[in-house]
UniProtKB/Swiss-Prot annotation:
It comes from the Viruses. Coiled coil: none annotated. It is a multi-pass membrane protein. The gene is SIFV0074. GO terms for cellular component: host cell membrane; membrane. This is Putative transmembrane protein 74. Keywords: Host membrane, Membrane, Transmembrane, Transmembrane helix. It is found in: Host membrane. The chain crosses the membrane at residues 4-24, 35-55.
Length: 60
């Protein structure tokens, strides 16, 4: 088990959840294109990381 990988996944998840919360509190953030790009980036990182971890687990 790669602890660095797990820690980075948790950090990404917490930041993404906090950003989604801020978006619900202040929907005008969606008018800022960079905010949307950052949200998409964090979501993509979480999805790719989940798939990578699942693929590593199935090799054993």
């Amino acid at each position: 088990m790669n602890y660095f990988s797990v820690i980075m996944y948790l950090i990404n998840s917490v930041i993404f959840t906090f950003m989604i919360f801020l978006t619900f509190v202040n929907p005008s953030l969606l008018n800022d294109q960079y905010w949307v790009y950052i949200l998409i980036g964090f979501f993509t990182a979480i999805v790719f990381h989940s798939g990578y971890q699942a693929g590593k687990g199935s090799e054993k």
